[in-house]
Amino acid sequence: MKTVEIIEGIASGRTSARDVCEEALATIGATDGLINAFTCRTVERARAEADAIDVRRARGEVLPPLAGLPYAVKNLFDIEGVTTLAGSKINRTLPPARADAVLVQRLKAAGAVLLGGLNMDEFAYGFTTENTHYGPTRNPHDTGRIAGGSSGGSGAAIAAGQVPLSLGSDTNGSIRVPASLCGVWGLKPTFGRLSRRGTYPFVHSIDHLGPLADSVEGLALAYDAMQGPDPLDPGCSASRIQPSVPVLSQGIAGLRIGVLGGWFRDNAGPAARAAVDVAALTLGASEVVMWPDAEIGRAAAFVITASEGGCLHLDDLRIRPQDFEPLSVDRFISGVLQPVAWYLRAQRFRRVYRDKVNALFRDWDILIAPATPISAPAIGTEWIEVNGTRHPCRPAMGLLTQPVSFAGCPVVAAPTWPGENDGMPIGVQLIAAPWNESLCLRAGKVLQDTGIARLKC
């Protein structure tokens, strides 16, 4: 059952929250030995939360919007009583979290049932979730391939039918990449939209949090439940709630929709270009739009990511570098050694860059681009080729996402299934101006309703 069917089934009494919970736990038990999406399961908590929903329904109470819906979170979200690993060996020695992360609190208030924590790249520094401490998360559509990252467990858990909803983080593409490679829906909200309090940071000035889901409705319901100001999070600049569910079915009539060319075409393989072409045709988009300074924006994002990420872990890099995984330790060290002038220059450029990007949206409401250059490569792949150019695999997965998140724009990643692509999915980015998540979701709903974007479980 999809998100809406689960919620309606519980509300109507056709099924119980406990039955839904037990079915999800059974699916996890049957599949996760191969997929490796989960790093912990909160079984007792899940059953207690599900039972509480069933009690409320039996009393005739009006149920909250996500009542009984199972979900799981990337293991950089605090879960009360659980150590927040952030994909690392180093964090194993930390005490258990004393409280849930704010977004987990808000989903609990909305009635969702937490089933556990999910695998990720160490400290969120990666695009593949080939974690050497906890093992690689495998793509449910071909278990010899990566699930993407750094929120790989969050994408794989949905694609494997383990949960209909998950939470991830996105600094340079870490929601959109696994959504693309696993064939699920993902939403990276506007920078500053959702509270980050109670999560383990990576790059404070770029980190975003958001949902992955089995449907556009799932994204919208979860997103609305998590919205709200947080005066205790200096990075949360949202001043009000802007519900997306009431406008989700308004369609795209009158919206100005363009297709990103240049960098976003040159760095997209045949399947990615085909996915965009079909989405553009469906959404009535024919004009090509050029995103300003995409390559420089990506380079500046790399500088800031390495610098902030490295400095955050400086003490551990000095005394226990051997406890970092090989895929991240060298990048953290190089980030610490970068001249501060590089960091300052990148941040100054970012202000100008945002202004240039925002100017695009004077003429356009939605812009379409591929989410990843190719579909999921095999686990262990070191190099990929895109249109005749050879790229190192791991950073190349973010070629098309980094320029967008660096500008802070909201994006929906829509799962499409191009022909002649070995049966593998690839995502399409639906991008809007800051604070216009609902436009992305509306366009996604059109792609879903026409069958262009969908899940295959």
From Swiss-Prot:
**SUPFAM superfamilies named in the record:** Amidase signature (AS) enzymes (SSF75304)
- Identify a single GO molecular function assigned to this protein: biuret amidohydrolase activity
Gene3D superfamilies from the UniProt entry: Amidase signature (AS) domain
Q: Does the keyword Hydrolase apply?
A: yes
- Name the InterPro entries on file: Amidase (IPR000120), Amidase_dom (IPR023631), AS_sf (IPR036928), Carboxybiuret_hydro_AtzE (IPR014087)
What this chain does, per the entry, is described as: Hydrolyzes 1-carboxybiuret to urea-1,3-dicarboxylate and NH(3).
Record note on quaternary structure: Heterotetramer consisting of 2 AtzE and 2 AtzG subunits.
Pathway where this protein functions: Xenobiotic degradation; atrazine degradation
Gene designation: atzE
Q: Which family is it part of?
A: Belongs to the amidase family.
What this protein catalyses is: 1-carboxybiuret + H2O = urea-1,3-dicarboxylate + NH4(+)
Question: Which EC number(s) does the record attach to this protein?
Answer: 3.5.1.131
Query: Which residues does UniProt mark as catalytic?
Result: K74 (charge relay system), S150 (charge relay system), S174 (acyl-ester intermediate)
What name does the UniProt record give this protein?
1-carboxybiuret hydrolase subunit AtzE
**Keywords, A to Z?**
Hydrolase, Plasmid
One of the protein's GO biological processes: atrazine catabolic process
